[in-house]
Design a protein with these regions (language model features):
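Carbohydrate-recognition beta-sandwich/jelly-roll modules
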Residues: 1-144, 149, 167, 185-188
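Aromatic-lined carbohydrate-binding/catalytic grooves of carbohydrate-active enzymes
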Residues: 101-267
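Alpha-helix-loop-beta-strand connector modules within alpha/beta enzyme cores
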Residues: 178-182, 281-290
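Exposed, low-structure sequence patches enriched in small/polar residues
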Residues: 264-265, 282-284, 296
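Short, contiguous acidic/charged loop-to-helix segments that flank catalytic cores in large enzymes
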Residues: 269-272
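Charged helix-capping and loop-helix junction motifs
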Residues: 274-280
């Protein structure tokens, strides 16, 4: 194991944002008919020199001191065979664990509460009523609510002013009441933020924050105002992003559980949004006591505990539904909602009836979904089983022969 933040040399992925973080290199050589395997840590960054989009250079200090660990093991799962599964079980003793990963098996009832376009469709105290409603129908099973549009005039307004909690939705007072009272019903709350794009109404918007590509603006999403690319390296090196998260922390204290970082990895804020930048972003979030979650199915493998495109099975392209590595799922099925779910019509690894995978639905406006009954039925049909199994670590994996039902 290594904590290298390097992107690796040959790894392919559909997006950046930490998806290419290669921490160990394996090299196979053959000499006089004898093959040998060597393992080595990838490069570490200590004091990294970076240049923002306007040509200004900075030196950014290390995220943490370089580390590598080795473990040697025997038949850990007692199946009379020593193979990669025994190595994976032993690897858990030395690997990194995403912050607050132990919460994941308890989060049975994920959903999005949506506010958009200044309409405050789901004020914070209405969301609290819905928390109580779901708690009654699930005997208090854990809930995880993503407040998409908590700030400014709602979703994709006012980025990246993280502390601009929307007044129409109830302001900081009602948001804290939602989180404090909701916790009594087993609910945890997080917010949707953006570290790549900003909007002209944001207080953080400035010429220094704008990313320039050959002198031109970098553009993002544009369904209300036109999103303008943030100069992510400037934002990082100058401590601007970190200070905005700190301002939010002053308002919400310890009430909030997680942060969802939208679109990170689509290269709006820099030419790379690489694993090092991603680890820096994650540390700003986890240092404030917030769990890290993100959008893309393969994004931020090191720190993220939830990938929206992996769990919202009918949203986004079917080829981008999450991590499909058998080894990764063996290691971390209990730590993440980041896997290709059980959705057989997609084919391939999406046919996963044993471990399942989170199947996200909503009833508070996201994607126009408003069917509460369907939400509850889906929890019991798909997600209760998935979450039950996440309480246990995988120790023995056997691929059976497929059966064709006739």
């Amino acid at each position: 194991w290594s904590n290298s933040e390097h992107n690796g040399r040959v790894v392919a992925a559909p997006v950046q944002g930490g998806s290419q973080n290669t921490r160990i290199y394996a090299t196979v050589t053959e000499v006089e008919g004898t093959k040998t395997l060597g393992l080595a840590s990838a490069e570490w960054y200590y004091h990294r020199n970076i240049t923002d989009s306007k040509g200004v250079e900075y030196t950014v200090t290390e995220t943490e001191m370089p580390q590598s660990k080795i473990t040697i093991t025997g038949d850990r799962n007692e199946d009379q065979t020593i193979d990669w599964q025994d190595g994976a079980i032993a690897f858990r003793d030395i690997m990194n664990n995403p912050y607050k990963y132990e919460e994941v098996p308890e989060l049975v009832a994920w959903r999005i509460a949506m506010n958009f376009g200044g309409q405050a469709q789901n004020p914070f105290l209405t969301t609290l009523d819905n928390v109580k409603r779901v708690a009654m129908h699930t005997d208090g099973l854990g809930q995880s609510i993503l407040l998409k549009g908590y700030g400014n005039e709602g979703h994709d307004s006012g980025h990246p002013d993280y502390a601009d909690i929307g007044q129409r939705m109830g302001g900081a007072e009602d948001m804290n009441m939602l989180m404090e009272k909701g916790a009594e019903y087993g609910a945890r709350f997080g917010i949707h933020v953006n570290a790549s794009e900003m909007y002209p109404e944001a207080k953080a918007f400035s010429e220094e924050m704008v990313r320039r590509v050959n002198g031109n603006l970098s553009y993002g999403w544009n369904w209300i105002d036109q999103g303008i690319g943030i100069d992510g390296l400037y934002d990082l090196a100058m401590g601007m992003r970190e200070s905005r998260f700190d301002e939010l922390k002053e308002l919400v204290g310890d009430n909030m559980d997680f942060i969802y970082v939208d679109v990170w990895g689509n290269l709006t804020s820099s030419n790379s949004e690489d694993s090092w930048e991603t680890r820096k972003l994650s540390k700003m979030i986890t240092d404030n006591g917030w769990r890290m979650t993100t959008e893309w199915g393969s994004g931020n493998e090191y720190d993220s505990t939830f990938q929206h495109w992996a769990t919202d099975l009918t949203y986004g392209g079917y080829t981008s539904k999450g991590e499909n590595s058998e080894v990764m799922r063996f290691l971390r099925n209990h730590q993440k909602d980041s896997w290709v779910g059980d959705y057989p019509s997609y084919g391939g690894v999406a046919n996963s009836p044993l471990l399942g995978g989170y199947n996200m639905k909503d009833f508070e406006g996201w994607q126009g979904r408003n069917d509460y009954d369907a939400y509850i039925v889906n929890l019991y049909t798909h997600n209760l089983m998935t979450k039950f199994l996440q309480h246990y670590q995988v120790v023995d994996w056997e691929d059976g022969a497929p059966v064709q039902m006739t």
